[in-house]
């Protein structure tokens, strides 16, 4: 997996765009059982990421669900990790728009369905969400297009690019 680390370093340095990187990372599972990959994603999320969930975000999502809001998770991260993550928030698998590929008879292919990033996030949302988007939350510059289509936009623990854009647009910025 040294090549994957090197490729990720290229992405972090700006040599590879997010759509390409996330597309490559989801297609590399080609030929594997989706059940096996989903279990591995769940174990990874639970052991490495779940403890980093901001309690205030968990509480906010819970309150929004309780008030009847239609909540979607939109991410360029692979669908398997996002499914595992959304279990912690009570968000249905049918409300996930993430990097994904076609699966045939339980086996992952290398045929991309979507990689929602940048403009692709707002396009993916418009394909499935009817009406106006009340609120959107993002943490990187790849979320700007999605944040721009919401009535209320929130930059949560934003990277410097998004923080600058959020200040310029007078969006709410939150650092936990």
What is each residue range found by the language model?
Residues 1-14:
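Conserved phosphoryl-transfer catalytic core
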Residues 13-16, 91:
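Secretory-pathway/luminal and periplasmic proteins that interact with or process carbohydrate-rich
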Residues 16, 20-31:
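Extracytoplasmic ligand-binding site segments that recognize negatively charged/polar headgroups
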Residues 30-176:
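C-terminal cap/substrate-recognition subdomain and adjoining C-terminal extension
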